């Protein structure tokens, strides 16, 4: 029996050591969880094999527009005959996403040319395409087209029933303004035609990029966008109107004016355009590549087909 106190003492010591060990483990775990994550530059560099695997995975990403047939409506920035760039934005999209391009953009055209381009698309390809991208508006600004209004209003009778027997009442009634002499009227005419011609085709509108000096001889000198046009309207008013198309006509709008980052108003940004001294209107290859990257990322969030 004389060993009993000794055994009890040893047991107490073991218990204390076990508790101390558990406390240390708990403390270490808490410190680990509380420790801030190391910044990326402190992490172990990837091996060449890991890099190759990630690049392969990126290339294999299934973009929703990959391999689709897309029609492009627009002006000189879309026109394949304009030599400011060897590859247009739609050409880069063709390379990167294997998109088949049907290009109808013509230099100098304005929003009132969209119905003609739509008719040509229908004549050449019928219904055998997936989507339409519209990149238009800079020439409407340059030619001083008034902005106009989206709607006209009348007071009309309409039958209404709201928790009581129906009755005829007078209410304001909106109608799309189909004025071919204003920007919004032209857009309404174009979108009305497209929505009825192709009700189940994805239509995407893009805002015009920033613009600076363009000088092509004595009879074609276009000041930069910091000057009002002949109507006393600044360029950004046209951009704002085109952005509104999304809600008026239920179409996605890619705001290239902001998202592309192209800014030719400063000399530093002129490197993305054709000629720093005379053409800061038309992007060069680098500018078109930047536009295409922006468009590709924006399209990744949109279905190409209904």
Where are these regions (language model features)?
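Bacterial N-terminal signal peptides that target proteins for export
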Residues: 17-27
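Sec/Tat signal peptide C-region and signal peptidase I cleavage site
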Residues: 38-42
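Polybasic, lysine-rich low-complexity intrinsically disordered segments
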Residues: 11-15
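Serine-esterase "nucleophile elbow" of acetyl-processing enzymes
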Residues: 43-107, 112-127, 132, 267-269
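Bacterial N-terminal signal peptides
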Residues: 28-36
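Alpha-helical cap/lid subdomain in secreted, periplasmic
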Residues: 96, 118-306
């Amino acid at each position: 029996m004389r060993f009993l106190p000794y055994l009890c003492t040893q047991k107490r010591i073991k218990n204390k050591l076990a508790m101390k060990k558990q406390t240390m483990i708990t403390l270490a775990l808490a410190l680990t969880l509380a420790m801030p994550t190391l910044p990326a530059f402190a992490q172990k560099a990837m091996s060449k094999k890991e890099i190759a695997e990630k690049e392969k995975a990126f290339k294999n990403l299934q973009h929703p527009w990959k391999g689709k047939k897309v029609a492009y409506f627009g002006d000189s920035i879309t026109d394949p005959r304009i030599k400011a760039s060897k590859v247009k934005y739609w050409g880069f999209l063709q390379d990167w996403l294997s998109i088949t391009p049907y290009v109808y953009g013509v230099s100098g055209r304005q929003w009132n040319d969209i119905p003609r381009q739509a008719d040509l698309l229908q004549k050449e390809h019928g219904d055998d395409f997936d989507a339409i991208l519209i990149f238009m508006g800079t020439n409407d600004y340059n030619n001083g087209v008034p902005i106009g209004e989206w709607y006209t209003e009348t007071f009309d009778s309409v039958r209404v029933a709201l928790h009581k027997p129906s009755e005829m009442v007078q209410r304001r009634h909106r109608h799309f303004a189909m004025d071919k002499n204003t920007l919004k009227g032209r857009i309404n005419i174009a979108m009305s035609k497209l929505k009825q011609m192709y009700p189940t085709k994805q239509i995407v509108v893009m805002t015009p990029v920033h613009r600076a000096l363009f000088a092509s001889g004595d009879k074609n000198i276009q000041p930069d966008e910091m000057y009002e046009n002949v109507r006393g309207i600044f360029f950004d008013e046209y951009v704002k109107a085109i952005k509104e198309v999304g809600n008026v006509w239920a179409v996605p709008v890619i705001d290239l004016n902001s998202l592309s980052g192209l800014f030719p108003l400063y000399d530093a940004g002129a490197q993305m355009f054709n000629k720093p001294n005379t053409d800061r209107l038309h992007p060069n290859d680098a500018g078109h590549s930047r536009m295409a990257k922006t468009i590709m990322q924006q399209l990744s969030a949109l279905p190409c087909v209904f």
